[in-house]
């Protein structure tokens, strides 16, 4: 519902003028979010450009999406839509959804390892509750295991977890193995606790493949070598609260 409202709000602003990059990001967001009712005419009307311009944009997007094995389908009389595996769609969302769909303004980041601009982007594109629950889970991991993620890893986790919750709540779940059978990441004990916490916060159920998604994220994340930094981050958070 929040996503529909955000797009509806953007539709009302007919004076908005976008660059090609912004237009493509908007179209990518609509397609990757699972909308299948958008025609070239509708994109043309909303973005105040010709159908020829939209067609050229979609051709450019086709080349980008092919890097993730995502196909753009154009059926006469129907909307433009994509097909591809769920894991690839999430990776593409992280790469290409670079402009805010909503207009919520953030004055201060909730953690000093992420920028106001990034937090604003995630909240406007993937929902404030999804963002807040994702950050709460990361803080839970850090507090439970006495670690502190690096700035880059904290940002990566927040982004991907936010996208995961956004997709799962829309009914788009991973349905196949994304970790090869011969690869053992050995994070299963931590993952179980994280999934339990995430499920409790979000009221969502995560299947075995969604657990693999979290396992990959945790295995990719790096922690600060200085444990005193973790205490400083925790102290800073308490002062802000």
Locate predicted features.
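A cross-family "folded-core" feature that marks the main globular domain of proteins
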Residues: 1-241
